[in-house]
Amino acid sequence: MIKVIIADDHKLVREAWNLLLSRDKRLSIIAICENGSQVIEACKTLSPDVVLMDINMEPVSGIEATRVIREHTDDIRIIGISVHTDLPYVNALMHAGANGYVTKNSSGEEMIHAIMLVMEGKQYFCKEIADIISS
């Protein structure tokens, strides 16, 4: 099973991702965090395979949390999740050490696909971001 941590500052988003991803028997949601500080601590104690990381959280952003997690390990796969499609956000997260980027316009099916690909060691960009990068 792939151990997943969900990190988002919006309760409804956390609950929706949890509900959706819990239906896939390959995934196990091991923690749900509401800010960057919580996800950093959860990564230290729970050793997830994948973190789904909202980039806009307070007081510690998803970008900063990604950077801190990367200072401790390269073993955890991190997929950024955001409403932002601007390349500076994508670049900042990827430079911090993320393995992928998915916008909140993406489907649950696409998120599961992203998880599977980053677990294979590949980078993943949702179609919306891939189209922007290629244009």
Question: Where do the PLM segments sit?
Answer:
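Active-site residues of response regulator receiver
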Residues: D8, D54, S82
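A short, hydrophobic beta-strand element within the central beta-sheet of small alpha/beta folds
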Residues: I76-T85
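Acidic catalytic/metal-coordinating carboxylates
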Residues: N35-Q38, V60-E64
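Short amphipathic alpha-helix used as the core "switch/output" element in two-component signaling
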Residues: E41, I63-D74
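Short hydrophobic/Thr-rich beta-strand motif most characteristic of the beta2 strand and flanking loop
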Residues: R26-E34, A42
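The feature encodes the CheY-like receiver
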Residues: V13, M53, E58
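Active-site beta3 strand of CheY-like receiver
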Residues: L46-L52
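Short, flexible helix-to-coil linker/hinge segments that flank and couple to helix-turn-helix
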Residues: P88-H95, G100-S135
